[in-house]
């Protein structure tokens, strides 16, 4: 009823996805970033605008979590505090 397939045929893939990271020379393992706020036991505050500048791009955009490494909870709080600092003119909306 069932064909007898040896284990080598069953495990190999024809589309080239098996062990793709070993074959791709550009593949790199990235060190997982840790949240700076969790490590230092602090919360983002709009009054610390020098520290908040680290989380803003040159154009004035808020950096995403995948780049900064902040946790979801602290990223939401960080965005609110940056917006408060912008509203109070401690941080610019747009950098030139």
From Swiss-Prot:
Function: Binds as a heterodimer with protein bS6 to the central domain of the 16S rRNA, where it helps stabilize the platform of the 30S subunit.
Species of origin: Borrelia duttonii (strain Ly)
Record gene name: rpsR
SUPFAM superfamilies noted in UniProt: Ribosomal protein S18 (SSF46911)
Compositional bias segments (type: Basic and acidic residues): 1-22
An example Gene Ontology molecular-function term: structural constituent of ribosome
Pfam families: Ribosomal_S18 (PF01084)
GO BP field: translation
GO cellular component: cytosolic small ribosomal subunit
Region described as Disordered: 1-25
Protein name as catalogued: Small ribosomal subunit protein bS18
Family, as annotated: Belongs to the bacterial ribosomal protein bS18 family.
UniProt subunit comment: Part of the 30S ribosomal subunit. Forms a tight heterodimer with protein bS6.
Leader sequence residues: none
């Amino acid at each position: 009823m069932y064909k007898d397939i040896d284990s080598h045929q069953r495990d190999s893939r024809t589309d080239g996805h098996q062990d793709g990271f070993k074959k791709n020379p550009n593949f790199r393992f990235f060190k997982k970033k840790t949240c700076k706020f969790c490590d230092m036991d602090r919360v983002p505050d709009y009054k610390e605008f020098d520290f908040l500048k680290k989380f803003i791009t040159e154009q004035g955009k808020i950096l995403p979590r995948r780049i900064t490494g902040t946790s979801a909870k602290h990223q939401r709080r960080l965005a609110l505090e940056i917006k408060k600092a912008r509203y109070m003119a401690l941080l610019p909306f747009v950098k030139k």
